[in-house]
Amino acid sequence: MITSQKTLSIEASPQEVWEFLTDFPSYPSWVTDVVEAVVEAPRLERGTRINILRLYGNRRVNGVEEITEWEPLKRLRMQTPSGSFIADAIYTLKSEQGGTQVNYEVQIVGHGFSKILEWFIRGNFQKLVDSEFARMKTMLETRHVTV
């Protein structure tokens, strides 16, 4: 099993952070391996599925993530219902003075041959999460900068 946890403060309102996290088509701009994310429904809510195309090396992998918890401005939980890797990711938002605290927790379990790949992925996974969250923080905080 691969696990990661990240907590950071972002100088943006919970509304802005929530809108950013739930703008799935924009995921390729900050989530490293995502090439495309397409929402299957006209409205985001519990049960909504998102088709995600990821690029691992030269290999394109299609997958589905499902929203399993939906508490606007507070909590978003997404799970992959099937595949070589089963992921369970939780974003929790908390208003704080000057912005929003974001807590992220993820567990990924490989099945079959992918179980062997966990060992290779685990080493760099936290660095990847740290990089993506730094990118998210920069993108949200620079929205307020005027030139």
Regions found by a protein language model. Name each.
Residues M1-A41, E45, V147:
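Hydrophobic ligand-binding cavity/cleft-lining segments
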Residues T3-Q5, R60-V64, F85-I90:
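Short, surface-exposed coil-to-beta transition loops
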Residues T7-E11, V38, L53, E66, ...:
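Generic structural detector for well-ordered beta-strands
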Residues P14-Q15, P42-R43, T68-L73, T92-Q101:
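A short, structured loop/turn motif at beta-sheet edges
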Residues R59-T68, Q79:
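Helix-adjacent hinge/juxtasegments
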Residues Q79-S131, T138, V147:
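Beta-strand/loop substructures that line and gate deep hydrophobic ligand-binding cavities in soluble
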